[in-house]
Amino acid sequence: MIILGVDPGLTRCGVGVIEAGEHRRLSFIHVDVVRSSPDITQDLRLLAIYNGLSEKMDRFAPDAVSIERVFAQSNRNTVLGTAQAAGLAMLAAAQRGIPVALHTPTEAKLAITGNGQAQKVQVERMVTRVLNLTKMPTPADAADALALAICHALRPAGALQGGEREQHLTAAQRQWAEAAQNSTRRRKNSDRGM
């Protein structure tokens, strides 16, 4: 299984590609950062990120895309750009019929280091070790993208949807899923005039 990990960002969007073989054997394929210049308009920045992600998906034809789930941060502009980049990754995957999984930073850290509160340098070292790399991937966005791909490969739920996936959710993930379902129901009911 080829897994493409995405660490979303508007200036630097990390992309890491691995292969998960039998017995969870992981192999490095590619790592890169898709960039957009802060000197161009927002629409052109989004287009640059979308085109870069689309090119990677077309080039590597992943079986799954693993994207960092965006959480609120204190810097509104940062979270907006990150959420937009995550949405572009989901769109590019959906257009190609590729299943998408969202993983929190804590999940990725836990999967790769065994510690959900691990520091960035610990994650980078473990990514390097797990994938047998000769040096740490840089910048950090690239290492994070590989960590997300590794997380997806090692998670028992993977990209499963529905009940089987729900067995493996943390309490916070269950609350998030319930809130998303309730929001969807409210929207559908309001569209029907209920």
Swiss-Prot record:
Compositionally biased tracts (Basic residues): 184-194
SUPFAM superfamilies: Ribonuclease H-like (SSF53098)
Cofactor: Mg(2+)
Compartment annotation: Cytoplasm
GO biological process terms held by the UniProt record: DNA recombination; DNA repair
Cofactor note: Binds 2 Mg(2+) ion per subunit.
Catalytic activity: Endonucleolytic cleavage at a junction such as a reciprocal single-stranded crossover between two homologous DNA duplexes (Holliday junction)
A GO cellular component entry from the record: cytoplasm
InterPro entries in the cross-refs: RNaseH-like_sf (IPR012337), RNaseH_sf (IPR036397), X-over_junc_endoDNase_Mg_BS (IPR020563), X-over_junc_endoDNase_RuvC (IPR002176)
Positions of region (Disordered): 162-194
Keyword tags: Cytoplasm, DNA damage, DNA recombination, DNA repair, DNA-binding, Endonuclease, Hydrolase, Magnesium, Metal-binding, Nuclease
Binding locations of Mg(2+) 1: D7, D141
Signal peptide range: none
Example GO molecular function: crossover junction DNA endonuclease activity
Binding partners and assembly: Homodimer which binds Holliday junction (HJ) DNA. The HJ becomes 2-fold symmetrical on binding to RuvC with unstacked arms; it has a different conformation from HJ DNA in complex with RuvA. In the full resolvosome a probable DNA-RuvA(4)-RuvB(12)-RuvC(2) complex forms which resolves the HJ.
Function per UniProt: The RuvA-RuvB-RuvC complex processes Holliday junction (HJ) DNA during genetic recombination and DNA repair. Endonuclease that resolves HJ intermediates. Cleaves cruciform DNA by making single-stranded nicks across the HJ at symmetrical positions within the homologous arms, yielding a 5'-phosphate and a 3'-hydroxyl group; requires a central core of homology in the junction. The consensus cleavage sequence is 5'-(A/T)TT(C/G)-3'. Cleavage occurs on the 3'-side of the TT dinucleotide at the point of strand exchange.
Family: Belongs to the RuvC family.
Entry protein name: Crossover junction endodeoxyribonuclease RuvC
Organism the protein comes from: Bifidobacterium longum subsp. infantis (strain ATCC 15697 / DSM 20088 / JCM 1222 / NCTC 11817 / S12)
